A protein has these predicted regions:
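Membrane-embedded alpha-helical segments of multi-pass membrane proteins
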Residues: 1-4, 26, 30, 48-56, ...
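Hydrophobic core of alpha-helical transmembrane segments in multi-pass integral membrane proteins
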Residues: 3-4, 55-59, 81-86, 134-144, ...
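Hydrophobic alpha-helical transmembrane segments of multi-pass membrane proteins
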Residues: 16-32
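Juxtamembrane "helix-exit" motif on the non-cytosolic side of transmembrane helices
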Residues: 29-37, 84-93, 145-151
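Membrane-proximal helix-loop-helix units in multi-pass membrane proteins
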Residues: 56-121
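Hydrophobic alpha-helical transmembrane segments in multi-pass integral membrane proteins
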Residues: 115, 121, 138-154
């Protein structure tokens, strides 16, 4: 699926990138739960698959976007992260991914969401840069710290802190442990 879903990004940018994002977030957990695969090199092939779907998203920027400033910001964010992934591959230091956050992905999502309701050509230079800065500072830096510095796992967090179970609890048991939380998450 991580090879197929991204192919829909140029035609259906928002739903396809969101599906790719969810698959990216869930694949390690799926592999851990349902296979006996050795996941020692997971970070490396995960980054390669990220580059694959984000490359398609980057190409979709040129195909679909109409705001020149947003295109230029997306280009910078894309290449900045690409340099970071390359440095990570060379040095195998997780902090590098914190310094070079994947702001491009969420910027793409924000632009695609804006595009569903408004004409993005109306976004000012200041608004585009402000949006990218907001995503970088308040969303991506904390998230990259959580993943690459603290090395926390989102699925473990959900099971322990949201559903009140242990990380090894099955998802079926975790969800049934707190049905009100499950209902609230679905309703949101």
């Amino acid at each position: 699926l991580r090879f197929v879903i991204p192919l829909f990004i140029p035609r259906f940018p928002l739903p396809a990138i969101l599906a790719a994002l969810v698959l990216d977030a869930a694949d390690q957990t799926i592999f851990q739960q349902f296979t006996n695969l050795n996941l020692d090199g997971y970070q490396n092939y995960d980054k390669a698959l990220d580059i694959f779907y984000l490359t398609i998203a980057f190409l979709a920027v040129y195909r679909n976007w109409t705001n020149t400033t947003a295109i230029n910001v997306a280009r910078f964010l894309w290449y900045y992260r690409l340099v970071g992934v390359w440095l990570f591959e060379v040095f195998q230091q997780r902090w590098i991914l914190f310094v070079f956050p994947n702001t491009f992905e969420y910027f793409f999502i924000a632009y695609a969401a804006i595009r569903t309701q408004w004409d993005p050509r109306r976004l000012t230079h200041r608004a585009v840069i402000g949006l990218a800065a907001f995503i970088w500072i308040f969303i991506k830096l904390p998230q990259e710290w959580w993943i690459h510095i603290a090395q926390n796992d989102f699925t473990d967090f959900m099971k322990v802190d949201v559903f009140g179970t242990t990380p090894t609890t099955s998802w079926a048991d975790a969800i049934t442990n707190r049905p009100a939380v499950t209902f609230a998450l679905i309703a949101a």
